Amino acid sequence: MSHRVSILSSHFSPASAVMASEKEAALAATPSDSPTIFDKIISKEIPSTVVFEDDKVLAFRDITPQGPVHILLIPKVRDGLTGLSKAEERHIDILGRLLYTAKLVAKQEGLAEGFRIVINDGPQGCQSVYHIHVHLIGGRQMNWPPG
């Protein structure tokens, strides 16, 4: 297994605490249109704990949560949208759908007191999977500034 695949796999395994950090995974990741681990989650090749699914968006619990609630929301079809910096006008609808779905999931998860939305973009933004995804984190008091 290549170093890059090992790091990306560690992001979704319980042993990730002893594996590579998110920063290392982001620095090892290569932006491309190649299938990602999220494509395998969408196709159910890799199990996940789904909390929301419709025809456009899949939301599931992060395997390495950064709060009591940590959910990833992804578009089911990437359409070249590997990161926010790659967004084009044709992506407006799915970007809005991801954020609106985050609001629905936050309500479903009981996050009435607030939550944080994060989109990492590129190596310096700590993006480790090049399939745009929204982190919904809540259930605790957040700090400012973030990382």
UniProtKB/Swiss-Prot annotation:
<dbReference type="Pfam" id="PF01230">
    <property type="entry name" value="HIT"/>
</dbReference>
<dbReference type="InterPro" id="IPR036265">
    <property type="entry name" value="HIT-like_sf"/>
</dbReference>
<dbReference type="GO" id="GO:0009507">
    <property type="term" value="C:chloroplast"/>
</dbReference>
<keyword id="KW-0576">Peroxisome</keyword>
<protein>
    <recommendedName>
        <fullName>Adenylylsulfatase HINT1</fullName>
        <ecNumber>3.6.2.1</ecNumber>
    </recommendedName>
</protein>
<dbReference type="GO" id="GO:0099503">
    <property type="term" value="C:secretory vesicle"/>
</dbReference>
<dbReference type="GO" id="GO:0006790">
    <property type="term" value="P:sulfur compound metabolic process"/>
</dbReference>
<dbReference type="InterPro" id="IPR019808">
    <property type="entry name" value="Histidine_triad_CS"/>
</dbReference>
<keyword id="KW-0378">Hydrolase</keyword>
<keyword id="KW-0934">Plastid</keyword>
<dbReference type="GO" id="GO:0005886">
    <property type="term" value="C:plasma membrane"/>
</dbReference>
<dbReference type="InterPro" id="IPR001310">
    <property type="entry name" value="Histidine_triad_HIT"/>
</dbReference>
<comment type="function">
    <text>Possesses adenylylsulfatase activity in vitro.</text>
</comment>
<feature type="short sequence motif" description="Histidine triad motif">
    <location>
        <begin position="131"/>
        <end position="135"/>
    </location>
</feature>
<dbReference type="InterPro" id="IPR011146">
    <property type="entry name" value="HIT-like"/>
</dbReference>
<feature type="active site" description="Tele-AMP-histidine intermediate">
    <location>
        <position position="133"/>
    </location>
</feature>
<dbReference type="GO" id="GO:0000166">
    <property type="term" value="F:nucleotide binding"/>
</dbReference>
<keyword id="KW-0547">Nucleotide-binding</keyword>
<dbReference type="GO" id="GO:0005777">
    <property type="term" value="C:peroxisome"/>
</dbReference>
<dbReference type="GO" id="GO:0005829">
    <property type="term" value="C:cytosol"/>
</dbReference>
<feature type="binding site">
    <location>
        <position position="135"/>
    </location>
    <ligand>
        <name>substrate</name>
    </ligand>
</feature>
<keyword id="KW-0150">Chloroplast</keyword>
<feature type="domain" description="HIT">
    <location>
        <begin position="37"/>
        <end position="147"/>
    </location>
</feature>
<dbReference type="GO" id="GO:0009150">
    <property type="term" value="P:purine ribonucleotide metabolic process"/>
</dbReference>
<dbReference type="GO" id="GO:0047627">
    <property type="term" value="F:adenylylsulfatase activity"/>
</dbReference>
